[in-house]
């Protein structure tokens, strides 16, 4: 009898208090639509159903059940994407309890960022309020740091946010030796030796993964190695390997490793990508550029070498996307793209480098990156160019759901603007 009562009460709860996650139909009317992948629609409508873009254009049928948003005078853009961040894995640098980005040891390719992402991170709301709706959240620290996850910036728990788990494996390429000018010969030898050993470990691990892949294909029984098993799709070219690099020498070294082991490589960081732009184009390797606001790597470089790198990559024909990096700085992603426009990057290319291009590089362009029928409805509606500092996001949709623009920043503003 109690079981029947429980079932009845459960049924009544669903009828009287429907789950908030149930999809609703929305219509954004009279809005300028920058599709990014096609022509801009001067004035049209966007229909959102079941979390996706169902229709768009100047003459579409809008169901009477749709919740209508009149966006006259505003512009719709696809939600922006940062293709290499630490959002959800780190909160406050000085508080170790909020850090879940590093694991001990050098070989952690089996560690998944999705297992540690904090959906309630303050960085989530702050970042999306500036129009960034999707990020790649990546581990750091180790040589093989782990597997990154692509998430939408809305959801109660990680499962709600997850767009693609195990999207790429992060490999922190051994850094060039950088010592002060007064370093002695022994210090230089020790540093070079340490770097050489890390390169040897990188190659050995990838060779072992290739051997392990052959055993897996042959269905040979034996003890399972979690780290090597996680690298099987990487050495088979089924999962991208994101190499973090900065100098031209590091970029060349990572490209050599990618060629040697036939990896599907993506380069992240790339402060000196401008030095090897033609090489990157010839290798057809995409770049996630995150050094725009950094100082030049050499005192002999021009002051604007980093600011002009996106223009140099674009001119050379290198597919690239912007990455603000870290967690707290991701909110500045659109403004970094805007700054690059001031140093020679075409304005349309800058917009694509924070929308369509990162989606293509991360192999999620069938879901996000542009405003097209059938794609996930990640849409921002602004009162101006989203790459300009004085523009504001007025409405935000993530996975077809309107999302509040409140954040820790707006809460603090509201609190202290009332101060007597």
PLM features: what roles do these ranges have?
Residues 8-18:
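Bacterial N-terminal signal peptides
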Residues 21-25:
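Boundary at the C-terminal end of the N-terminal hydrophobic targeting segment
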Residues 31, 46, 51, 73, ...:
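Divalent metal-coordination and catalytic microenvironments
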Residues 31-34, 44, 372-416:
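C-terminal cap of metal-dependent C-N hydrolases
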Residues 33, 37-77:
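Histidine-rich, glycine-flanked metal-binding segment
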Residues 74-141:
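Metal-associated gating/positioning segment near the N- to mid-region
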Residues 92-93, 98-104, 109-110, 240, ...:
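His/Asp/Glu-enriched, well-ordered alpha-helical/loop segment
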Residues 123, 128-265, 392:
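Polyanionic/metal-chelating signatures
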């Amino acid at each position: 009898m109690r079981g029947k009562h429980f079932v009845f009460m459960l049924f009544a709860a669903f009828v009287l208090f429907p789950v908030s996650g149930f999809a609703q139909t929305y219509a954004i009317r009279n809005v300028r639509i920058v599709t990014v992948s096609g022509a801009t629609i001067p004035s049209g409508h966007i229909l959102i159903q079941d979390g996706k873009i169902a229709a768009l254009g100047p003459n579409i049928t809008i169901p009477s059940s749709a919740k209508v948003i009149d966006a006259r005078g505003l512009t719709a853009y696809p939600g922006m994407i940062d293709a290499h961040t630490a959002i959800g894995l780190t909160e406050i640098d000085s508080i170790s309890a909020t850090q879940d980005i590093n694991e001990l040891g050098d070989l952690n390719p089996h560690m998944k960022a999705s297992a540690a992402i904090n959906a309630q991170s303050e960085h989530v709301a702050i970042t999306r309020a500036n129009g960034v709706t999707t990020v790649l959240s990546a581990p750091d620290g180790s040589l093989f740091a782990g597997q990154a996850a692509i998430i939408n910036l809305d959801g109660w728990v990680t499962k709600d946010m997850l767009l693609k788990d195990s999207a790429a494996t992060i490999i922190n390429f051994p850094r060039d030796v950088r010592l002060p000018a007064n370093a002695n010969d022994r210090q230089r030898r020790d540093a070079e030796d340490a770097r050489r050993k890390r390169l040897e470990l990188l190659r050995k691990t990838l060779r072992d993964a290739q051997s392990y892949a052959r055993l897996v294909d042959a269905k040979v029984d034996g003890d399972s190695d979690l780290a090597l098993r996680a690298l099987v799709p990487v050495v088979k070219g089924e999962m991208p390997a994101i190499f973090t690099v900065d100098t031209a020498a590091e970029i060349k070294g990572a490209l050599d490793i990618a060629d040697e082991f036939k990896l599907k490589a993506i380069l992240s960081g790339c402060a000196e990508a401008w030095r090897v732009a033609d090489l990157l184009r010839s290798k057809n390797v995409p770049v996630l550029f995150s050094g725009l606001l950094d100082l030049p790597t050499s005192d002999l470089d021009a002051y604007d070498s980093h600011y002009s790198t996106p223009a140099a990559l674009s001119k050379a024909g290198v597919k690239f996307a912007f990455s603000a990096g870290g967690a707290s700085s991701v909110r500045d992603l659109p403004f970094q793209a805007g700054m690059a426009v001031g140093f020679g990057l075409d304005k349309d290319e800058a917009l694509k480098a924070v929308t369509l291009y990162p989606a293509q590089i991360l192999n999620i362009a069938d879901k996000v990156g542009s405003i097209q029928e059938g794609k996930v409805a990640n849409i921002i509606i602004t009162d101006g160019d989203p790459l300009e500092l004085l523009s504001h996001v007025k409405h935000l949709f993530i996975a077809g759901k309107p999302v509040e623009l409140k954040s820790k920043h707006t809460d603090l503003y509201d609190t202290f603007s009332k101060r007597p």
